[in-house]
């Protein structure tokens, strides 16, 4: 059934950096956009760089900020990674120009891969400097991850106001490296502030995309071919799927036999057919897809979720008042997904289950109480809604505007 809360909510130094040879390429489409900027009038307009990408957890909040900046009349250029996940998501936003940077994650200092990291970082740094000479940014925002490091450093050396956003409850390596270069560190969780004791911090929440607005629950279920009045579980593994969660659901299907439940399951590319076949054999109603571009449909149709606990996913779950069974990615840096999940557990908006604990039908034993106790489901939904920061993108933009001057 569509729970009551768902029905209510519709709605480096400059002297060391010699003049690099090799100029970066900017595609004609981007240059055409920038050439068309309106310099007339008294209203403040910024050229803004947002460095995001590499995972959906960096990219989607960056896109959300870009949407608000553009709505306020600012020019925006995204810096993203060369990963397929970025290209796939940006196909849905052809109006936002972007550049790809060849950065990779920071390997161990003793790994042979460190040489490749340095080469790619230098290439990204040179490309940023070339683009900045043309675009003349007035503000730069890094969303974390090593796609953001070179742009923030190049911006600092140019004297441009720079900011970083840390969505997680514990900061990543890239943001810890660049924090002292920026005007302010913007936070998704207040619990992260103690990690930046010598830097100004502001808690904004984690931005979510403007299209993520609640739809009518029954209409959303109808679009997915599901029944209007059956408790609906959303299973998702983040922007790249999660084989561990997929396998746990498959093992749990026999124990869910006879439960008044239907499932929306995003599998990622590799497991889509396998998962769909298992739902059919179990005769459990399900909408199964590798990915889905209209996530607002899925969130609106669901009563609760099984999910990873990346910061972007948690922000979206809270925006739709969805309580969750959270299974943190066990190999996340510094176990940050577990720290994120703990915030929601403390608020009684989620339960935390380690991936090592979802053996046999263990996941089913966590799912069944949500189906059987609607009072608990409603209470946890209300608690999840209290964690929502739907205005986070606007808060990020307002902070950027506050610290930034119009001087070019």
Question: What are the language-model segments listed below?
Answer:
Residues 6-14, 18-19, 24-41:
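A cross-taxon signal for low-complexity, glycine/charged-rich
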Residues 376-390:
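A short, well-ordered alpha-helix in the C-terminal region of glycosyltransferases
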Residues 84-94, 217-305, 338-342, 346, ...:
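Donor-nucleotide binding loops and adjacent catalytic segments primarily
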Residues 389-408:
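C-terminal alpha-helical cap of glycosyltransferases
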Residues 47-53, 70-120, 271, 356:
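Conserved nucleotide-sugar phosphate-binding/catalytic loop shared by glycosyltransferases and other
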Residues 108-139:
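An amphipathic, basic-hydrophobic alpha-helix
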Residues 137-139, 292, 300-315, 322-323:
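Acidic donor-binding loop of glycosyltransferase active sites
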Residues 75, 96-97, 156-218:
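Active-site-proximal region of nucleotide-activated glycan assembly enzymes
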């Amino acid at each position: 059934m569509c729970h009551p809360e768902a029905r209510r909510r519709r709605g480096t130094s400059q002297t060391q950096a010699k003049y690099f040879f090799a100029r970066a390429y900017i595609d004609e489409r981007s240059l055409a956009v920038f050439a068309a900027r309106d310099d007339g009038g008294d209203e403040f307009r910024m050229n803004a760089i947002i460095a995001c990408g590499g995972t959906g957890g960096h990219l989607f909040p960056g896109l959300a900020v870009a949407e608000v900046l553009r709505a306020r009349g600012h020019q925006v250029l995204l810096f993203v990674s060369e990963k397929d996940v970025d290209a796939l998501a940006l196909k849905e936003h052809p109006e936002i120009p972007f550049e790809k940077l060849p950065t990779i994650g920071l390997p161990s200092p003793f790994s042979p891969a460190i040489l490749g990291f340095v080469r790619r970082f230098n290439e990204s740094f040179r490309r940023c400097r070339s683009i900045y000479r043309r675009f003349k940014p007035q503000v730069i925002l890094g969303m974390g991850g090593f796609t953001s490091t070179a742009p923030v450093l190049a911006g600092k050396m140019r004297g441009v106001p720079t900011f970083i956003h840390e969505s997680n409850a514990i900061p990543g390596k890239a943001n810890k490296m660049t924090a002292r270069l920026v005007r302010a560190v913007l936070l998704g969780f207040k619990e992260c502030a103690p990690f930046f004791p010598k830097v100004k911090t502001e808690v904004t929440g984690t931005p979510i995309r403007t299209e993520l607005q609640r739809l009518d629950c029954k209409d959303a279920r109808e679009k997915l071919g599901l029944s209007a009045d059956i408790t609906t579980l959303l299973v998702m593994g983040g922007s790249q799927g999660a084989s561990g969660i997929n396998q746990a659901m498959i093992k749990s299907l026999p124990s869910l036999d006879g439960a008044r439940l239907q499932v929306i399951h995003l599998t990622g590319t590799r497991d889509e057919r396998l998962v769909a076949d298992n739902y059919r054999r179990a005769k459990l109603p399900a909408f199964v897809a590798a990915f889905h571009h209209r996530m607002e449909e899925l969130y609106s149709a669901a009563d609760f979720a099984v999910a990873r606990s990346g910061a972007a996913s948690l922000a979206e779950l809270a925006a739709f008042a969805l309580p969750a069974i959270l299974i943190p990615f066990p190999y996340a840096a510094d176990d940050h997904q577990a720290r994120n999940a703990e915030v929601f557990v403390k608020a009684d908006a989620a339960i935390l289950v380690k991936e090592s604990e979802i053996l046999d039908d263990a996941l089913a034993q966590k799912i069944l109480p949500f189906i059987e106790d609607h009072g608990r489901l409603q209470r946890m939904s209300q608690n999840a809604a209290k964690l929502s920061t739907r205005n986070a993108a606007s808060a990020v933009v307002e902070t950027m505007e506050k610290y930034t001057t119009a001087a070019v």
